[in-house]
Amino acid sequence: MVDVKALADFEDDDAAKEDIYRLEGFYLGGINSLRGYAPRSVGPKSGDFTGQEGAGIDLGGNFMVLTNLEVTFPLVQEAGLKGVVFMDMGDTWSRLEPVKFRDMKLTSGVGLRWLSPLGPLRLEWGYKITESDDVSDTDKSRFEFSIGTFF
């Protein structure tokens, strides 16, 4: 089965300027968005405004684009075990800019899905095709585990 998810969202830029340390805003990274990137690691940082790009406090973006493509297939149908191959692409920005696909974060990977008695379990490995802007997120790939659904 092939699943595609596409999201684009924005937050009122003038309202966002009033919140210096806001918990809201758009962050990407982690098993439910850009797999392969650390959770909430993709987005503007305070260092981006002081010349230390990719360093500092996570600020969250005002604009966000995310696309996920998955192909799932049965591995052990009687047990409810499935395999998944995926590709994710997205980014967040502090101000509206033309979207350049060559600058978007891109990941791919594989995983296992099991419909257990506890609910859907996911074990996925994501690999960064593009480099991270976050100086603290130096891993090229990461394993992640989740209980619950994605699509």
What are these regions (language model features)?
Residues Y127-E131:
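A short, acidic, flexible beta-alpha connecting loop/helix-capping segment that sits on the rim
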Residues R102-D103, D137-S141:
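Short, conserved loop/turn and helix-capping segments at secondary-structure boundaries
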Residues M64-N68, K105-G109, R142:
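Transmembrane beta-barrel architecture of outer-membrane proteins
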Residues M1-L81, F86-M89, W93-R95, D133-S136, ...:
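C-terminal outer-membrane beta-barrel translocator/porin domains of Gram-negative envelope proteins
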Residues V110-S116, L121, D139-F151:
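Outer-membrane beta-barrel "beta-signal"
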Residues L81-F86, P120-G126:
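Conserved active-site loop/cleft motifs that coordinate metal ions or position small ligands
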Residues R40-S46, M104-T107, L118-W125:
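Low-complexity, flexible helical/coil segments
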Residues R95, V99-S116:
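Strand-loop-strand
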